[in-house]
A protein has these predicted regions:
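Short, solvent-exposed loop/turn segments at secondary-structure junctions
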Residues: 59-60, 96-99, 122-125, 157-158
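Active-site proximal beta-strand in glycosyltransferases
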Residues: 90-92, 106-125
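Membrane-proximal helix-turn-helix segments that form the acceptor-binding/catalytic region
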Residues: 133-150
Length: 161
């Protein structure tokens, strides 16, 4: 079996009950994500002037918590731009650490004239995620279309995205 034929991370639970139920839960999760996004932005005026940043999570992990991947960047940024869960004017998302419902949140933010900033640091590929790599890339591609600004971590990331 070649490396390309070996199961990727996304193929490991193929055939399990969880994998079979996943398509049924997707519409429910999308509705919940939209409701959650609407709640975050309901009744809040978008402030002008100083940047008020929301990173997509209620809490940004502190210094004493083990943080991995792209969310390390968020922790560093939050020291300068504290996480603001309501009344924010910038939504900053990291592609390797997207919150659930990231696309719905970004769409709702755009409707409220909130600036959407994406830190793009890679894409899924078959060797990593198996046959399901496209399903992981779809929300990232949508976020890139929505974004007002994208920080690409490398030229390769820009080309691959």
């Amino acid at each position: 079996m070649s490396d390309f034929e070996k199961p990727g991370w996304g193929d490991r639970d193929e055939g399990s009950l969880r994998a079979r139920l996943r398509p049924l839960s997707l519409p429910v999760r999308k509705v919940l994500a939209r409701l959650k996004a609407a709640y975050r932005l309901i009744g809040s005026a978008v402030p002008h002037g100083e940047a008020r940043v929301f990173y997509g999570y209620r809490r940004v992990q502190g210094e004493k918590t083990v943080t991995i991947g792209g969310l390390v960047k968020v922790r560093a940024l939050a020291r300068v731009f504290p996480n603001t869960t309501h009344g924010f004017n910038v939504l900053y998302l990291v592609s390797s650490g997207l919150p659930r419902g990231a696309v719905a949140l970004a769409q709702a933010a755009k409707r409220k004239n909130v600036r959407v900033v994406i830190n793009q640091n890679g894409v899924a590929y078959p060797g990593w995620y198996g046959k399901k790599f496209k399903s992981l890339n779809e929300p990232m591609a949508e976020l890139l279309r929505i974004a007002d600004h994208v920080f690409y971590q490398s030229e390769f990331c820009r080309m691959a995205a």
